[in-house]
């Protein structure tokens, strides 16, 4: 009788998946490209190693015994990686992400040399396999957006098996853990602080970072360009225009919070300080982002990829044309200065941190819990801005002038923000447009922080249009529905008011409330 283990001509029943790894079968010229003629040492490799060895040889590991013929193809397809930047086939894991050879080399050239990439369009170019070379500025921006970092480069350039690397990493981690447990307490604290600073992101300490590291983290934290997705026909009316703008603002606020959490050192601040900084500067941050998107389109304001407005379209809303004019003028000034990406991300972070670094009006704004930490972050980012300007090759006098010109423009953005806040509040009082929960929280918080009126009058003022005064304090206390009015908020916790006393109907818990009677926002920050 014929033994079942002898070599027989190939048939549909015979395949490497039907036999143990030690059994082989003969191939004829008509058989497929499945070959199992590999050594026993190669059979011990993981699936991940096998996929990268050869296309015409395929060995079956222990997990492959008894599987169907389609399982091997599925495993091979599952291990296929694509470049995070251009979606081409990835050649390896470089600079912190899976990338192809082209994008890896491009990012390496960009971070090693001095680059002044400028987008000829609107900073929204599509970067894919066919168009990745069309715009260097957008390609580099996408590299940062997907998480490519200078610190993510592999120091080993040899072709080392991933299995050995994993084993080495495991043993190194075990030895570090043992060293950490046996080290004295003071050395343990130093080790933990250095580990956190190397991790990057909002939890890392900004102290001790080089200016180049700070710039890389700031660029990597930038949010994506959003789409409005509102199907409203032109010409816009007052209601449709405000609906478009408030809807986009609410979407951007969510991404703004995510952006702030990625800033180095931000998550080390107390929750109170995080919320206060965001509440005090949210519209300025959104405006400088709008200016940056519109910098290469004279006469246009790019609110979203599918929402581009010109000055004339602002006439449909009373008071909007004036704000559009100020935005276009500031954008033109930044265009004249040829604002660079590194300068933009620094200015944006400075706006956030400078909003609460100094409490000029302690009667209307609670002081920060850790003002020194915020000031250190502000100083470090300012130093990064100065460092980048110093690399431009200009004279010291020209560098000082450029720094002054950039920082002076922040006062114009603050002025536009105040104008925009008053306009948005007037639209709210007129009930012209529905406002969303997050946008309402930010708007109400800004009204509380404002120093131009006493805190006791806010509850009454929130029910009246701006520029109208009311001295009726009884209405302020009665609108709170008991002892939750402004009078009780002034003792101990600063001039915080109960959100139940605000004019809008309750729409669930606020997402950025803090202090006293205001709800917790830890589920957002």
From Swiss-Prot:
Highest taxon of the lineage: Eukaryota
Span list, region Modulating: 1-82
InterPro entries: Est_rcpt/est-rel_rcp, Estr_rcpt_N, NHR-like_dom_sf, Nucl_hrmn_rcpt_lig-bd, Nuclear_hormone_rcpt_NR3, Nuclear_hrmn_rcpt, Znf_hrmn_rcpt, Znf_NHR/GATA
DNA-binding region ranges: 83-148
Record keywords: DNA-binding, Lipid-binding, Metal-binding, Nucleus, Receptor, Steroid-binding, Transcription, Transcription regulation, Zinc, Zinc-finger
Region (Disordered): 1-59, 154-203, 452-525
Matches recorded under SMART domains: HOLI, ZnF_C4
One Pfam family recorded for the sequence: Oest_recep
Chief location: nucleus
Residues of the signal peptide: none
UniProt cross-references to SUPFAM superfamilies, sorted A to Z: Glucocorticoid receptor-like (DNA-binding domain), Nuclear receptor ligand-binding domain
Classification via PANTHER family: KNIRPS-RELATED PROTEIN-RELATED (PTHR48092)
Function as written in the Swiss-Prot or TrEMBL entry: The steroid hormones and their receptors are involved in the regulation of eukaryotic gene expression and affect cellular proliferation and differentiation in target tissues.
Similarity comment: Belongs to the nuclear hormone receptor family. NR3 subfamily.
Quaternary structure (record): Binds DNA as a homodimer. Can form a heterodimer with ER-beta.
UniProt name for this protein: Estrogen receptor
């Amino acid at each position: 009788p014929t033994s079942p283990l002898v070599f027989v001509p190939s048939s549909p029943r015979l395949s490497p998946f039907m036999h143990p790894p030690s059994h082989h079968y003969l191939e004829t010229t008509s058989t497929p490209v499945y070959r199992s003629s590999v050594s026993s040492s190669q059979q011990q490799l993981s699936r991940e190693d096998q996929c990268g060895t050869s296309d015409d040889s395929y060995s079956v590991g222990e997990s492959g015994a008894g599987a169907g013929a389609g399982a091997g193809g599925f495993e091979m397809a599952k291990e296929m990686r694509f470049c995070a930047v251009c979606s081409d086939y990835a050649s390896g894991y470089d600079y912190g992400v899976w990338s192809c050879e082209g994008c890896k080399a491009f990012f390496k050239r960009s971070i090693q040399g001095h680059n002044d990439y400028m987008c000829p369009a609107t900073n929204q170019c599509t970067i894919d396999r066919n168009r990745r070379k069309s715009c260097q500025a957008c390609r580099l921006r996408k590299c940062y957006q997907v998480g490519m970092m200078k610190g993510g480069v592999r120091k080993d350039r040899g072709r080392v098996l991933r299995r050995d690397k994993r084993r080495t990493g495991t043993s190194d981690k075990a030895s570090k853990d043992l060293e950490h447990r046996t080290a004295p307490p003071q050395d343990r604290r130093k080790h933990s602080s250095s580990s956190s600073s190397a991790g990057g992101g909002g939890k890392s300490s900004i102290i001790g970072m080089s200016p180049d590291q700070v710039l890389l983290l700031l660029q990597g934290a930038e949010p994506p360009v959003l789409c409005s997705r509102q199907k409203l026909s032109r010409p816009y009316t007052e209601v449709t225009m405000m609906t478009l703008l408030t809807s986009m603002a609410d979407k951007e606020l969510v991404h703004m919070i995510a952006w702030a959490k990625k800033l180095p050192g931000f998550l080390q601040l107390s929750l109170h300080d995080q919320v206060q900084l965001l509440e005090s500067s949210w519209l300025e941050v959104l405006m400088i982002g709008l200016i940056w998107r519109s910098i290469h389109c004279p006469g246009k304001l790019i609110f979203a990829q599918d929402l581009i407005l010109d000055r004339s379209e602002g006439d449909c809303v009373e008071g909007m044309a004036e704000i559009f004019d100020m935005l276009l003028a500031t954008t033109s000034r930044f265009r004249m200065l040829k604002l660079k990406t590194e300068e933009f991300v620094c200015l944006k972070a400075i706006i956030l941190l400078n909003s609460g670094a100094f409490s000029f009006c302690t009667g209307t704004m609670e002081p920060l819990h850790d003002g020194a930490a915020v000031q250190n972050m502000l100083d470090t980012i300012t130093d990064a801005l100065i460092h980048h300007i110093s690399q431009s090759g200009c004279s010291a006098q020209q560098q000082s002038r450029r720094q002054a010109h950039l920082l002076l423009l922040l006062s114009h953005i603050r002025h536009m923000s105040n104008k925009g806040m008053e306009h948005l509040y007037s639209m709210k009082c007129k009930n012209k447009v529905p406002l969303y929960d997050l946008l309402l929280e930010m708007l109400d918080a800004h009204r509380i922080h404002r120093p131009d009126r006493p805190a006791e009058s806010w509850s009454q003022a929130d029910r009246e249009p701006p520029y109208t005064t009311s001295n009726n304090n009884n209405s302020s206390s009665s609108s709170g529905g008991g002892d939750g009015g402004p009078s009780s908020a002034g003792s101990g916790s600063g001039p915080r008011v109960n959100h139940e006393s605000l004019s809008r109907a309750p729409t669930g818990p606020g997402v950025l409330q803090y202090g006293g009677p205001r709800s917790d926002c830890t589920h957002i920050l």
